[in-house]
Amino acid sequence: MKEQKWIHEGLITESLPNGMFRVRLDNEDMILGYVSGKIRRSFIRILPGDRVKIEVSRYDSTRGRIIYRLRNKDSKD
């Protein structure tokens, strides 16, 4: 049976080494996020200030996998 995961939206606050980021969720929790394989392979650039969707395990709510970078309204990408 596949593990159930929560999907949250948040804001990247800090960039850490090896594709890790500190993310502030919309409910004001701070968690550690890492980049998923598809984002890494597609060379999608994630910078502090970006809004992302993050997948969090029910068993460890302090870490999550960044699965999508949301488009900013003011950027031209």
UniProtKB/Swiss-Prot annotation:
SUPFAM superfamilies tied to this protein: Nucleic acid-binding proteins
Q: Which UniProt keywords apply?
A: Chloroplast, Initiation factor, Plastid, Protein biosynthesis, RNA-binding, rRNA-binding
Task: Please give the InterPro entries that the UniProt record associates with this protein.
Answer: NA-bd_OB-fold, RNA-binding_domain_S1_IF1, S1_domain, TIF_IF1
Give the CDD domains listed for this entry.
Answer: S1_IF1
Its subcellular locations are:
Plastid, Chloroplast
- Give one Pfam family: eIF-1a
Tell me where it mainly resides: plastid
Source species, domain of life: Eukaryota
**Its job:** One of the essential components for the initiation of protein synthesis. Stabilizes the binding of IF-2 and IF-3 on the 30S subunit to which N-formylmethionyl-tRNA(fMet) subsequently binds. Helps modulate mRNA selection, yielding the 30S pre-initiation complex (PIC). Upon addition of the 50S ribosomal subunit IF-1, IF-2 and IF-3 are released leaving the mature 70S translation initiation complex.
- Please describe the quaternary structure of this protein: Component of the 30S ribosomal translation pre-initiation complex which assembles on the 30S ribosome in the order IF-2 and IF-3, IF-1 and N-formylmethionyl-tRNA(fMet); mRNA recruitment can occur at any time during PIC assembly.
User: Entry's HAMAP family?
Assistant: IF_1 (MF_00075)
Recorded protein name is Translation initiation factor IF-1, chloroplastic
- Specify the taxonomic lineage: Eukaryota, Viridiplantae, Streptophyta, Embryophyta, Tracheophyta
Q: What gene name is given for the protein in this entry?
A: infA
